[in-house]
Amino acid sequence: MTNLRKTHPLMKIINSSFIDLPAPSNISSWWNFGSLLGICLIVQILTGLFLAMHYTSDTMTAFSSVTHICRDVNYGWLIRYLHANGASMFFICLFLHVGRGLYYGSYMFLETWNIGVLLLFAVMATAFMGYVLPWGQMSFWGVTVITNLLSAIPYIGSDLVEWIWGGFSVDKATLTRFFAFHFILPFIIAALAGVHLLFLHETGSNNPSGLCSDADKIPFHPYYTIKDILGVLLLILVLTSLVLFSPDLLGDPDNYTPANPLNTPPHIKPEWYFLFAYAILRSIPNKLGGVLALVLSILVLAVVPFLHTSKQRSMMFRPFSQCLFWILVADLLTLTWIGGQPVEHPFIIIGQLASILYFLLILVLMPITSLFENNLLKW
C-alpha cells in the first residue's frame, strides 16, 4: 500500500512542501528565517485573536480595555506582551530574511522576491495599525502625523486624509476601521506567504554559493525540519526572555498615557522597526519629497533584481560587494538611531547623509562595484 502522505490530496501538498521537498545540501542558518517568520505569524494571529476577544475599539474605552486585559484577564498581560514583542521579533526576522536575500542574490527569483516586497509592505501596514489600537499618546499622535502625510499628494491629498480618518480628525471612526483592518490583514499576509512559498517551490531554494544545486539535493525532512526546530527554540527563548524580564524595553513610555488631542508629546516617533524609514522621511524638508522617499525606501527593493550586474549570483566570492553590503547594514542602523533622536543639530545632517548613502549604495555603488568585480575575473 502506498504511503498516505503521497496519495491523499491534502497530505500530498504538505508532503511536497515540507517532507519530501528536495533542498540544497549546503543552506546555512540564514535560511531558517522563512520558517521563523511563519511561526511569528502564527503566534501573532493566535495572541491577536485572544486580545480581540477582550478589546473594544472605541475611543472612550480602548485604553481601559487594554488595561483590563493586563490586570483582570487570566494571563492577559502575557498575551498582550507576547503580541507586542512578537511584532518586534517578526521584524527582526523580516530584516534578517531580506538581508540574506540581498547578500546571497535570492532576489533573482523575481516572483518570489516581488511577493516578498509586497509582504513587507503588508506587515508594515499591519504593525502601524496595531500600534494605534492601545490608544495611548504615541498611538494617537503617531497615526495623526503619518496619515497626515497623505495630504501631500497633489489634488486629492486632503480628501484622502479625511476619507481615511472618517471625519475631520483622528477619532472613533479611525480607531474602529484600523481595528478592522488590523484584524483582517494578517490573514491576507498568510495567503500571500502561501503564494510566496508556491513560487519558491517552483524554482527551489537558492544556496550560499549561488550556484545551481540540482546535482546535490537532500530531503527537507528530517534534515531541515530539525534545523528549523532549533531556530524556533532559539526564537521562543529570546521572545519569552523579552516578555518575562523586560516587556517594555522596545515600547514607548508615552503610550502608557491615554490619548489626549490637546497635549502633544515632546518627541513623536514610531516603533523601533519603523525608525529607519522615519529618519529618511524626516531628512527631506519638503513634505511630498519626504513621503516619496519613505515609500521608495522599501520600494527600492523591487528594483534590486534589475540592477544585478555581477556574473556571480551570491556575494560569497565578491569581497568588494561584501564591504558595501555591510556599509549598508551600518547605514540602516545609523538611520534607526537617528529616527529616535530629536530634530536638531547634528542629527539632521547625519540623517540626511545616511539617507543619501542608503539610496546611493543600492542604486549606484553596488551595481558599479559588481561590474568592477566582473573585470577582476579577467585578470
Curated annotation (Swiss-Prot):
GO biological process: mitochondrial electron transport, ubiquinol to cytochrome c
A Gene Ontology term for the protein's cellular component: respiratory chain complex III
Subcellular location: Mitochondrion inner membrane
Cofactor(s) needed for function: heme b
Positions bound to heme b b562: 83, 182
GO terms of molecular function: metal ion binding; ubiquinol-cytochrome-c reductase activity
Residues where a ubiquinone binds: 201
Residues annotated for heme b b566 binding in this entry: 97, 196
Superkingdom of the source species: Eukaryota
Keywords of the record: Electron transport, Heme, Iron, Membrane, Metal-binding, Mitochondrion, Mitochondrion inner membrane, Respiratory chain, Transmembrane, Transmembrane helix, Transport, Ubiquinone
Membrane topology: Multi-pass membrane protein
Note on cofactor: Binds 2 heme b groups non-covalently.
Pfam family, one: Cytochrome_B
Principal location listed in the UniProt entry: mitochondrion
Positions of transmembrane segments: 33-53, 77-98, 113-133, 178-198, 226-246, 288-308, 320-340, 347-367
Oligomer status and interactors: The cytochrome bc1 complex contains 11 subunits: 3 respiratory subunits (MT-CYB, CYC1 and UQCRFS1), 2 core proteins (UQCRC1 and UQCRC2) and 6 low-molecular weight proteins (UQCRH/QCR6, UQCRB/QCR7, UQCRQ/QCR8, UQCR10/QCR9, UQCR11/QCR10 and a cleavage product of UQCRFS1). This cytochrome bc1 complex then forms a dimer.
Family: Belongs to the cytochrome b family.
Function per UniProt: Component of the ubiquinol-cytochrome c reductase complex (complex III or cytochrome b-c1 complex) that is part of the mitochondrial respiratory chain. The b-c1 complex mediates electron transfer from ubiquinol to cytochrome c. Contributes to the generation of a proton gradient across the mitochondrial membrane that is then used for ATP synthesis.
Further information: Heme 1 (or BL or b562) is low-potential and absorbs at about 562 nm, and heme 2 (or BH or b566) is high-potential and absorbs at about 566 nm.
Protein name, UniProt field: Cytochrome b
Organism: Sorex jacksoni
Gene: MT-CYB
